[in-house]
Amino acid sequence: MSKIIEVTKDEFKQEVLERDLPVLVDFYTDGCGPCEAMVPVLDALSERLDGKIQIIKHKVTMEDVLEGQSWIVKEYDVLSFPTLMIFKDGEMLKQNFGALYEEELLKFLDVVL
């Protein structure tokens, strides 16, 4: 099973933008009900799509949003949670704001599957 990786803003470039596999990034924050609802969905998807896509989680704090402390938040306009983005070859291809069920998420990923 592909392991879901948690990355910091310092690891984002290497783990997301420079990865060979397509990457699904889940931008989340603490205390977010819809973010918590995505955990079992992402776990199931990680197992289902093993070797086809890498799932990465990136925690965003309120300081990142309100005080501009994260280049990622600025670059990709992450302002609501969860925000899901698909990256391939260092380029963001698609984004979604809000939680998705597994089948909806598979449709969202059609651009790289």
Which residues make up each language-model segment?
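Conserved beta-strand segments of the P-loop GTPase G domain that flank and frequently precede/overlap
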Residues: 25-27, 58-59
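Residues that scaffold the ATP/ADP-binding catalytic core of kinase and kinase-like folds
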Residues: 15, 35, 95-96
